[in-house]
Amino acid sequence: MTAAALRNTPLAITPELPSDRAAVEALVLAAFGPGRYAKTAERIREQARMTLGLVARDGDRIVGSVHLWAITVGEVPAVFLGPITVATDHRKGGLGGDLVAACVEAATQETVGGVLLVGDPPYFERFGFQPAPDARLPGPVDRRRVMWLPVMAPVPTGPVKAVA
Protein backbone atom coordinates (compact mmCIF):
# COMPACT_ATOMS: atom_id res chain seq x y z
CA MET A 1 0.00 0.00 0.00
CA THR A 2 1.37 3.42 -0.87
CA ALA A 3 1.56 6.27 1.59
CA ALA A 4 -1.01 8.20 -0.44
CA ALA A 5 -3.43 5.29 -0.32
CA LEU A 6 -2.78 4.89 3.39
CA ARG A 7 -3.96 8.42 4.12
CA ASN A 8 -7.33 7.54 2.62
CA THR A 9 -7.59 4.24 4.46
CA PRO A 10 -8.66 4.45 8.09
CA LEU A 11 -6.66 2.15 10.29
CA ALA A 12 -8.02 1.04 13.63
CA ILE A 13 -5.81 1.93 16.62
CA THR A 14 -6.93 -0.32 19.45
CA PRO A 15 -5.64 -1.63 22.77
CA GLU A 16 -3.12 -4.43 22.39
CA LEU A 17 -4.50 -7.85 23.24
CA PRO A 18 -2.49 -10.72 24.73
CA SER A 19 -2.97 -12.56 21.43
CA ASP A 20 -1.19 -9.66 19.64
CA ARG A 21 2.14 -10.16 21.46
CA ALA A 22 3.85 -12.35 18.85
CA ALA A 23 2.89 -10.04 15.97
CA VAL A 24 3.99 -6.96 17.92
CA GLU A 25 7.32 -8.56 18.83
CA ALA A 26 7.90 -9.47 15.17
CA LEU A 27 7.15 -5.88 14.15
CA VAL A 28 9.56 -4.49 16.77
CA LEU A 29 12.27 -6.94 15.73
CA ALA A 30 11.84 -5.97 12.06
CA ALA A 31 12.02 -2.27 12.93
CA PHE A 32 14.90 -2.28 15.42
CA GLY A 33 16.69 -5.60 15.03
CA PRO A 34 18.41 -7.46 17.84
CA GLY A 35 20.56 -4.38 18.59
CA ARG A 36 17.65 -2.89 20.49
CA TYR A 37 18.49 -5.14 23.44
CA ALA A 38 21.69 -3.16 23.97
CA LYS A 39 19.86 0.16 24.35
CA THR A 40 19.29 1.88 27.67
CA ALA A 41 15.61 2.38 26.83
CA GLU A 42 15.18 -1.37 26.54
CA ARG A 43 16.67 -1.83 30.03
CA ILE A 44 13.92 0.41 31.42
CA ARG A 45 11.16 -1.40 29.53
CA GLU A 46 12.39 -4.80 30.72
CA GLN A 47 11.86 -3.76 34.34
CA ALA A 48 8.80 -1.51 34.06
CA ARG A 49 5.12 -2.37 34.10
CA MET A 50 3.40 -1.72 30.79
CA THR A 51 0.53 0.70 31.40
CA LEU A 52 -0.72 0.83 27.81
CA GLY A 53 -0.14 -1.04 24.59
CA LEU A 54 -1.73 0.14 21.36
CA VAL A 55 -1.71 -1.50 17.95
CA ALA A 56 -2.72 -0.26 14.52
CA ARG A 57 -4.64 -2.78 12.46
CA ASP A 58 -5.07 -2.91 8.72
CA GLY A 59 -7.80 -5.51 8.57
CA ASP A 60 -6.51 -8.45 10.60
CA ARG A 61 -2.85 -7.44 10.25
CA ILE A 62 -0.99 -5.48 12.93
CA VAL A 63 0.94 -2.73 11.13
CA GLY A 64 1.96 -0.53 14.05
CA SER A 65 2.45 -0.56 17.80
CA VAL A 66 3.44 1.65 20.70
CA HIS A 67 3.65 1.23 24.48
CA LEU A 68 3.69 3.27 27.67
CA TRP A 69 5.66 2.02 30.69
CA ALA A 70 5.45 3.08 34.36
CA ILE A 71 8.50 5.02 35.55
CA THR A 72 9.54 7.77 37.91
CA VAL A 73 11.82 10.67 37.04
CA GLY A 74 13.27 11.84 40.32
CA GLU A 75 10.15 11.77 42.50
CA VAL A 76 7.74 12.43 39.62
CA PRO A 77 5.49 9.56 38.49
CA ALA A 78 5.57 9.34 34.71
CA VAL A 79 5.29 7.04 31.72
CA PHE A 80 7.99 6.09 29.24
CA LEU A 81 6.89 5.98 25.59
CA GLY A 82 8.24 3.44 23.15
CA PRO A 83 9.12 1.72 21.08
CA ILE A 84 7.03 3.06 18.22
CA THR A 85 6.93 0.64 15.30
CA VAL A 86 5.29 0.84 11.89
CA ALA A 87 5.41 -1.86 9.22
CA THR A 88 7.64 -0.92 6.28
CA ASP A 89 4.74 -0.80 3.83
CA HIS A 90 2.80 1.62 6.07
CA ARG A 91 5.56 4.18 6.70
CA LYS A 92 5.45 7.77 5.45
CA GLY A 93 1.68 7.88 5.82
CA GLY A 94 1.46 9.44 9.28
CA LEU A 95 0.73 6.25 11.21
CA GLY A 96 3.66 6.74 13.60
CA GLY A 97 2.32 10.19 14.45
CA ASP A 98 -1.17 8.77 14.95
CA LEU A 99 0.23 6.21 17.40
CA VAL A 100 2.17 8.88 19.32
CA ALA A 101 -0.91 11.12 19.43
CA ALA A 102 -3.02 8.24 20.78
CA CYS A 103 -0.45 7.61 23.54
CA VAL A 104 -0.26 11.29 24.40
CA GLU A 105 -4.06 11.45 24.62
CA ALA A 106 -4.11 8.40 26.91
CA ALA A 107 -1.33 9.84 29.09
CA THR A 108 -3.24 13.08 29.61
CA GLN A 109 -6.01 11.01 31.21
CA GLU A 110 -3.56 9.51 33.73
CA THR A 111 -2.32 10.94 37.02
CA VAL A 112 1.28 11.30 35.84
CA GLY A 113 3.70 14.17 35.70
CA GLY A 114 4.37 13.55 32.05
CA VAL A 115 5.68 11.36 29.28
CA LEU A 116 9.39 10.67 28.82
CA LEU A 117 10.99 9.25 25.68
CA VAL A 118 14.28 8.95 23.87
CA GLY A 119 13.80 10.07 20.29
CA ASP A 120 14.36 12.50 17.46
CA PRO A 121 13.67 16.04 18.74
CA PRO A 122 12.41 17.53 15.44
CA TYR A 123 9.85 14.72 15.15
CA PHE A 124 8.59 14.77 18.74
CA GLU A 125 8.57 18.54 19.29
CA ARG A 126 5.41 18.76 17.16
CA PHE A 127 3.59 16.75 19.84
CA GLY A 128 4.72 19.16 22.57
CA PHE A 129 7.78 17.24 23.78
CA GLN A 130 10.69 19.33 25.05
CA PRO A 131 14.28 18.57 26.04
CA ALA A 132 14.74 16.86 29.40
CA PRO A 133 18.54 16.78 29.72
CA ASP A 134 18.45 16.37 33.50
CA ALA A 135 16.37 13.19 33.44
CA ARG A 136 19.13 10.66 34.09
CA LEU A 137 18.58 7.29 32.44
CA PRO A 138 20.39 4.26 33.92
CA GLY A 139 22.86 3.88 31.07
CA PRO A 140 24.39 5.64 28.10
CA VAL A 141 22.06 7.84 26.07
CA ASP A 142 22.39 10.95 23.94
CA ARG A 143 20.94 13.56 26.33
CA ARG A 144 19.81 15.67 23.38
CA ARG A 145 17.33 12.90 22.54
CA VAL A 146 15.76 12.66 26.02
CA MET A 147 12.43 14.45 25.83
CA TRP A 148 9.50 15.22 28.14
CA LEU A 149 5.86 16.04 27.53
CA PRO A 150 4.40 17.76 30.59
CA VAL A 151 1.04 16.43 31.76
CA MET A 152 0.96 17.57 35.39
CA ALA A 153 4.59 18.54 36.02
CA PRO A 154 7.29 20.62 34.36
CA VAL A 155 10.46 18.98 33.08
CA PRO A 156 11.76 16.92 36.02
CA THR A 157 15.29 16.21 37.13
CA GLY A 158 16.73 13.08 38.65
CA PRO A 159 17.17 9.41 37.94
CA VAL A 160 14.73 7.53 35.73
CA LYS A 161 13.55 4.35 37.44
CA ALA A 162 11.23 1.62 36.25
CA VAL A 163 8.08 0.94 38.27
CA ALA A 164 7.17 -2.74 38.30
Predicted regions and their residues:
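Short amphipathic alpha-helix that is part of the acyltransferase structural core
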Residues: 2-40, 47-62, 153-164
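Short, solvent-exposed loop/turn elements at beta->coil junctions and helix N-caps
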Residues: 41-46, 135-137
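Conserved active-site alpha-helix within GNAT-family acetyltransferase domains
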Residues: 109-113, 118-143
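Non-DNA-binding regulatory cores of transcription-related proteins
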Residues: 133-150, 159-164
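Conserved beta-strand in the GNAT
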Residues: 55, 61-71, 77-85
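Conserved acetyl-CoA-binding loop-helix of GNAT-fold acetyltransferases
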Residues: 86, 92-105, 117
